[in-house]
Protein backbone atom coordinates (compact mmCIF):
# COMPACT_ATOMS: atom_id res chain seq x y z
CA UNK A 1 0.00 0.00 0.00
CA UNK A 2 2.90 2.33 0.80
CA UNK A 3 4.52 1.62 -2.55
CA UNK A 4 1.27 2.41 -4.39
CA UNK A 5 0.93 5.80 -2.64
CA UNK A 6 4.54 6.66 -3.46
CA UNK A 7 4.00 5.76 -7.11
CA UNK A 8 0.90 7.93 -7.30
CA UNK A 9 2.72 10.89 -5.76
CA UNK A 10 5.62 10.41 -8.20
CA UNK A 11 3.23 10.22 -11.14
CA UNK A 12 1.49 13.42 -10.09
CA UNK A 13 4.85 15.13 -9.68
CA UNK A 14 5.98 14.05 -13.13
CA UNK A 15 2.65 15.15 -14.54
CA UNK A 16 3.02 18.70 -13.21
CA UNK A 17 6.69 18.86 -14.20
CA UNK A 18 5.75 17.83 -17.73
CA UNK A 19 2.90 20.36 -17.86
CA UNK A 20 5.13 23.18 -16.62
CA UNK A 21 7.88 22.18 -19.07
CA UNK A 22 5.41 22.10 -21.94
CA UNK A 23 4.06 25.51 -20.95
CA UNK A 24 7.52 27.08 -20.64
CA UNK A 25 8.67 25.57 -23.95
CA UNK A 26 5.45 26.71 -25.61
CA UNK A 27 5.82 30.26 -24.29
CA UNK A 28 9.50 30.33 -25.31
CA UNK A 29 8.73 29.02 -28.77
CA UNK A 30 5.92 31.52 -29.18
CA UNK A 31 8.24 34.34 -28.07
CA UNK A 32 10.86 33.27 -30.62
CA UNK A 33 8.26 33.15 -33.39
CA UNK A 34 6.90 36.54 -32.33
CA UNK A 35 10.42 38.01 -32.29
CA UNK A 36 11.16 36.66 -35.77
CA UNK A 37 7.82 37.98 -37.02
CA UNK A 38 8.55 41.43 -35.57
CA UNK A 39 12.02 41.45 -37.14
CA UNK A 40 10.62 40.61 -40.57
CA UNK A 41 7.83 43.15 -40.12
CA UNK A 42 10.39 45.83 -39.26
CA UNK A 43 12.56 44.90 -42.24
CA UNK A 44 9.50 45.03 -44.48
CA UNK A 45 8.57 48.44 -43.06
CA UNK A 46 12.09 49.73 -43.74
CA UNK A 47 12.67 48.09 -47.13
CA UNK A 48 9.20 48.41 -48.68
CA UNK A 49 9.48 52.19 -49.32
CA UNK A 50 12.54 51.51 -51.48
CA UNK A 51 10.32 49.75 -54.01
CA UNK A 52 7.62 52.40 -53.86
CA UNK A 53 7.44 54.87 -56.72
CA UNK A 54 8.71 58.35 -55.91
CA UNK A 55 6.40 61.33 -56.07
CA UNK A 56 6.72 65.10 -56.29
CA UNK A 57 4.70 67.55 -54.24
CA UNK A 58 4.40 71.28 -54.77
CA UNK A 59 5.96 73.18 -51.89
CA UNK A 60 5.44 76.76 -50.76
CA UNK A 61 6.00 79.54 -53.25
CA UNK A 62 8.65 82.05 -52.25
CA UNK A 63 7.80 85.75 -52.42
CA UNK A 64 11.03 87.20 -53.74
CA UNK A 65 11.94 90.53 -55.28
CA UNK A 66 11.99 90.68 -59.07
CA UNK A 67 15.62 90.23 -60.05
CA UNK A 68 17.32 88.28 -62.85
CA UNK A 69 18.25 84.96 -61.24
CA UNK A 70 21.58 83.25 -61.89
CA UNK A 71 21.06 80.20 -59.65
CA UNK A 72 18.50 78.74 -57.25
CA UNK A 73 19.78 76.06 -54.88
CA UNK A 74 18.73 74.29 -51.70
CA UNK A 75 20.75 73.24 -48.67
CA UNK A 76 21.65 69.60 -48.21
CA UNK A 77 18.98 69.03 -45.54
CA UNK A 78 16.34 70.78 -47.65
CA UNK A 79 15.73 73.50 -45.06
CA UNK A 80 17.07 76.62 -46.79
CA UNK A 81 16.55 77.86 -50.36
CA UNK A 82 19.26 80.09 -51.81
CA UNK A 83 18.86 82.51 -54.71
CA UNK A 84 21.85 84.12 -56.41
CA UNK A 85 20.89 87.05 -58.63
CA UNK A 86 22.84 88.40 -61.59
CA UNK A 87 23.20 91.72 -59.75
CA UNK A 88 25.14 89.99 -56.95
CA UNK A 89 22.36 89.75 -54.36
CA UNK A 90 22.17 86.49 -52.37
CA UNK A 91 18.90 85.69 -50.59
CA UNK A 92 18.09 82.85 -48.21
CA UNK A 93 14.57 81.58 -47.54
CA UNK A 94 13.06 79.05 -45.18
CA UNK A 95 11.82 76.28 -47.44
CA UNK A 96 8.91 75.24 -45.21
CA UNK A 97 7.44 78.68 -44.54
CA UNK A 98 8.80 80.71 -47.45
CA UNK A 99 10.01 83.32 -44.95
CA UNK A 100 13.11 85.34 -45.87
CA UNK A 101 16.05 84.53 -43.58
CA UNK A 102 18.83 86.82 -44.79
CA UNK A 103 20.17 88.73 -47.76
CA UNK A 104 23.66 89.82 -48.79
CA UNK A 105 25.23 91.91 -51.54
CA UNK A 106 28.35 90.26 -52.96
CA UNK A 107 29.38 93.52 -54.59
CA UNK A 108 29.82 92.17 -58.11
CA UNK A 109 27.83 91.33 -61.22
CA UNK A 110 27.29 87.60 -61.79
CA UNK A 111 27.82 86.14 -65.26
CA UNK A 112 27.43 82.50 -64.13
CA UNK A 113 27.53 80.44 -60.94
CA UNK A 114 27.56 76.72 -60.15
CA UNK A 115 28.49 74.36 -57.33
CA UNK A 116 32.07 73.29 -56.71
CA UNK A 117 32.03 69.49 -56.84
CA UNK A 118 31.50 67.59 -54.56
CA UNK A 119 30.48 70.26 -52.02
CA UNK A 120 26.95 71.55 -51.53
CA UNK A 121 27.81 74.91 -49.95
CA UNK A 122 30.68 76.24 -52.11
CA UNK A 123 30.09 77.89 -55.47
CA UNK A 124 32.28 78.93 -58.40
CA UNK A 125 31.12 82.38 -59.53
CA UNK A 126 32.25 84.20 -62.67
CA UNK A 127 31.68 87.94 -62.70
CA UNK A 128 31.23 90.32 -65.64
CA UNK A 129 34.98 90.93 -65.79
CA UNK A 130 35.55 87.19 -66.25
CA UNK A 131 37.09 86.79 -62.81
CA UNK A 132 36.44 83.53 -60.95
CA UNK A 133 35.40 83.81 -57.27
CA UNK A 134 34.48 81.19 -54.69
CA UNK A 135 31.40 81.93 -52.60
CA UNK A 136 30.27 79.89 -49.60
CA UNK A 137 26.82 79.72 -48.04
CA UNK A 138 26.53 78.68 -44.39
CA UNK A 139 23.47 77.83 -42.31
CA UNK A 140 24.30 77.61 -38.61
CA UNK A 141 21.79 76.44 -36.00
CA UNK A 142 21.87 78.02 -32.54
CA UNK A 143 19.62 77.62 -29.50
CA UNK A 144 18.64 80.72 -27.55
CA UNK A 145 16.23 80.36 -24.61
CA UNK A 146 15.43 76.85 -25.81
CA UNK A 147 14.42 78.27 -29.20
CA UNK A 148 16.04 76.92 -32.36
CA UNK A 149 17.41 79.73 -34.53
CA UNK A 150 18.91 79.42 -38.00
CA UNK A 151 21.50 81.96 -39.15
CA UNK A 152 22.45 82.04 -42.85
CA UNK A 153 25.44 83.84 -44.31
CA UNK A 154 27.55 84.18 -47.45
CA UNK A 155 31.28 84.86 -47.71
CA UNK A 156 34.42 84.42 -49.83
CA UNK A 157 36.30 81.66 -47.96
CA UNK A 158 39.28 81.58 -50.36
CA UNK A 159 39.74 85.32 -50.61
CA UNK A 160 37.96 88.12 -52.42
CA UNK A 161 40.53 88.47 -55.21
CA UNK A 162 39.23 86.83 -58.36
CA UNK A 163 41.15 84.54 -60.72
CA UNK A 164 41.37 85.83 -64.30
CA UNK A 165 40.11 83.06 -66.60
CA UNK A 166 39.42 85.00 -69.79
CA UNK A 167 36.92 84.02 -72.48
CA UNK A 168 35.65 80.47 -71.93
CA UNK A 169 33.00 78.12 -73.31
CA UNK A 170 32.93 75.70 -70.33
CA UNK A 171 34.26 75.40 -66.78
CA UNK A 172 34.35 72.85 -63.96
CA UNK A 173 35.83 72.96 -60.46
CA UNK A 174 36.65 70.14 -58.05
CA UNK A 175 37.88 70.34 -54.45
CA UNK A 176 39.42 66.99 -53.47
CA UNK A 177 40.76 66.97 -49.91
CA UNK A 178 43.01 70.04 -49.94
CA UNK A 179 43.52 70.09 -53.72
CA UNK A 180 41.50 72.49 -55.86
CA UNK A 181 41.38 71.87 -59.61
CA UNK A 182 39.92 74.37 -62.08
CA UNK A 183 39.41 73.33 -65.70
CA UNK A 184 38.28 75.79 -68.36
CA UNK A 185 37.73 75.39 -72.09
CA UNK A 186 37.79 77.92 -74.89
CA UNK A 187 36.86 76.31 -78.21
CA UNK A 188 39.38 73.42 -78.49
CA UNK A 189 41.83 74.59 -75.83
CA UNK A 190 41.72 73.34 -72.24
CA UNK A 191 43.43 75.10 -69.34
CA UNK A 192 44.05 73.38 -65.99
CA UNK A 193 44.94 75.14 -62.74
CA UNK A 194 45.77 73.12 -59.65
CA UNK A 195 46.07 74.61 -56.15
CA UNK A 196 47.60 72.58 -53.32
CA UNK A 197 47.06 72.88 -49.54
CA UNK A 198 43.76 74.71 -49.93
CA UNK A 199 42.18 75.68 -46.61
CA UNK A 200 38.97 77.60 -46.01
CA UNK A 201 39.59 81.02 -44.53
CA UNK A 202 42.88 81.51 -46.35
CA UNK A 203 43.68 82.80 -49.82
CA UNK A 204 44.86 80.62 -52.67
CA UNK A 205 48.58 80.28 -53.34
CA UNK A 206 50.34 79.86 -56.66
CA UNK A 207 48.81 77.39 -59.10
CA UNK A 208 50.32 74.75 -61.34
CA UNK A 209 49.04 75.38 -64.86
CA UNK A 210 48.96 73.48 -68.12
CA UNK A 211 47.12 73.88 -71.42
CA UNK A 212 46.39 71.34 -74.15
CA UNK A 213 43.91 70.81 -76.97
CA UNK A 214 41.00 68.51 -77.75
CA UNK A 215 40.08 67.38 -81.24
CA UNK A 216 36.88 69.44 -81.37
CA UNK A 217 35.22 72.56 -79.98
CA UNK A 218 34.23 71.89 -76.35
CA UNK A 219 30.75 72.68 -75.02
CA UNK A 220 30.81 70.71 -71.73
CA UNK A 221 33.67 69.77 -69.47
CA UNK A 222 33.76 67.70 -66.27
CA UNK A 223 36.50 66.72 -63.86
CA UNK A 224 36.54 63.00 -63.07
CA UNK A 225 36.99 61.23 -59.72
CA UNK A 226 39.90 62.22 -57.46
CA UNK A 227 41.07 64.85 -59.99
CA UNK A 228 42.44 62.07 -62.21
CA UNK A 229 40.39 62.52 -65.42
CA UNK A 230 38.82 65.25 -67.52
CA UNK A 231 35.80 64.62 -69.75
CA UNK A 232 35.65 66.99 -72.73
CA UNK A 233 32.41 66.89 -74.73
CA UNK A 234 31.46 68.64 -77.97
CA UNK A 235 28.08 69.97 -79.07
CA UNK A 236 27.48 67.03 -81.43
CA UNK A 237 28.30 64.40 -78.78
CA UNK A 238 32.00 63.79 -79.35
CA UNK A 239 33.89 62.93 -76.17
CA UNK A 240 37.52 62.73 -75.17
CA UNK A 241 38.77 61.56 -71.78
CA UNK A 242 42.16 62.85 -70.64
CA UNK A 243 44.25 61.47 -67.80
CA UNK A 244 45.64 64.28 -65.65
CA UNK A 245 47.27 62.28 -62.86
CA UNK A 246 50.49 63.90 -64.06
CA UNK A 247 49.46 67.47 -64.67
CA UNK A 248 52.49 68.21 -66.82
CA UNK A 249 51.77 65.33 -69.19
CA UNK A 250 48.02 64.96 -69.85
CA UNK A 251 47.25 61.82 -71.86
CA UNK A 252 44.29 61.08 -74.11
CA UNK A 253 42.69 57.91 -72.69
CA UNK A 254 39.61 57.67 -74.90
CA UNK A 255 37.94 59.27 -77.89
CA UNK A 256 34.46 58.39 -79.14
CA UNK A 257 30.86 59.59 -79.28
CA UNK A 258 27.92 59.64 -76.88
CA UNK A 259 25.20 59.67 -79.55
CA UNK A 260 24.01 57.32 -82.27
CA UNK A 261 23.54 58.34 -85.93
CA UNK A 262 20.49 60.59 -86.23
CA UNK A 263 20.63 61.68 -82.58
CA UNK A 264 21.73 65.02 -81.16
CA UNK A 265 22.92 65.71 -77.63
CA UNK A 266 20.39 67.67 -75.54
CA UNK A 267 21.64 67.30 -71.93
CA UNK A 268 24.26 65.54 -69.86
CA UNK A 269 25.70 65.32 -66.36
CA UNK A 270 28.20 63.16 -64.43
CA UNK A 271 26.90 60.67 -61.86
CA UNK A 272 28.08 58.08 -59.31
CA UNK A 273 31.13 59.94 -58.06
CA UNK A 274 31.81 60.94 -61.68
CA UNK A 275 32.56 57.38 -62.72
CA UNK A 276 29.63 57.56 -65.14
CA UNK A 277 27.87 60.03 -67.44
CA UNK A 278 24.13 60.47 -68.02
CA UNK A 279 23.30 61.58 -71.55
CA UNK A 280 20.01 62.82 -73.03
CA UNK A 281 19.41 62.77 -76.78
CA UNK A 282 16.91 64.25 -79.22
CA UNK A 283 14.81 61.07 -79.45
CA UNK A 284 13.96 61.21 -75.71
CA UNK A 285 16.47 58.54 -74.70
CA UNK A 286 18.40 58.93 -71.45
CA UNK A 287 21.46 56.69 -71.25
CA UNK A 288 23.88 56.19 -68.40
CA UNK A 289 27.42 55.29 -69.49
CA UNK A 290 30.02 53.77 -67.20
CA UNK A 291 33.71 54.48 -67.70
CA UNK A 292 35.97 51.44 -67.36
CA UNK A 293 39.74 51.13 -67.60
CA UNK A 294 41.67 47.86 -67.85
CA UNK A 295 44.66 46.38 -69.66
CA UNK A 296 42.86 46.82 -72.99
CA UNK A 297 42.39 50.56 -72.40
CA UNK A 298 39.46 52.82 -71.56
CA UNK A 299 35.90 52.25 -72.75
CA UNK A 300 32.37 53.57 -72.27
CA UNK A 301 29.61 51.00 -71.74
CA UNK A 302 25.88 51.71 -71.52
CA UNK A 303 24.69 50.71 -68.03
CA UNK A 304 20.98 51.55 -68.22
CA UNK A 305 18.58 53.47 -70.44
CA UNK A 306 15.29 55.32 -69.97
CA UNK A 307 12.79 56.65 -72.49
CA UNK A 308 11.15 60.06 -72.01
CA UNK A 309 8.15 61.36 -73.95
CA UNK A 310 10.24 64.37 -75.05
CA UNK A 311 13.99 65.12 -75.02
CA UNK A 312 15.66 65.95 -71.72
CA UNK A 313 16.82 69.53 -71.38
CA UNK A 314 18.49 69.34 -67.99
CA UNK A 315 19.55 66.84 -65.34
CA UNK A 316 19.74 67.53 -61.61
CA UNK A 317 21.67 64.99 -59.54
CA UNK A 318 21.21 64.13 -55.88
CA UNK A 319 24.45 64.79 -53.95
CA UNK A 320 26.35 61.60 -53.05
CA UNK A 321 23.52 59.40 -54.33
CA UNK A 322 22.61 57.48 -57.48
CA UNK A 323 19.32 59.20 -58.26
CA UNK A 324 18.76 62.12 -60.59
CA UNK A 325 15.96 64.22 -62.01
CA UNK A 326 15.34 64.97 -65.69
CA UNK A 327 13.49 68.03 -66.94
CA UNK A 328 12.19 67.51 -70.49
CA UNK A 329 11.33 70.02 -73.21
CA UNK A 330 7.63 69.90 -72.28
CA UNK A 331 8.41 71.10 -68.75
CA UNK A 332 7.71 67.71 -67.16
CA UNK A 333 9.93 66.37 -64.38
CA UNK A 334 11.02 62.73 -64.20
CA UNK A 335 12.70 61.08 -61.20
CA UNK A 336 15.14 58.28 -61.99
Q: PLM features: residue spans?
A:
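Short coil/turn segments that connect the beta-strands within blades of beta-propeller domains
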Residues: 77-79, 119-121, 178-180, 226-228, ...
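Conserved beta-strand element within WD40/beta-propeller blades
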Residues: 33, 81-85, 123-126, 181-185, ...
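A short beta-strand motif characteristic of beta-propeller blades
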Residues: 58-64, 99-105, 154-163, 205-213, ...
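Transmembrane alpha-helical segments of polytopic membrane transport and secretion proteins
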Residues: 1-27, 53-75, 151-154, 158-160, ...
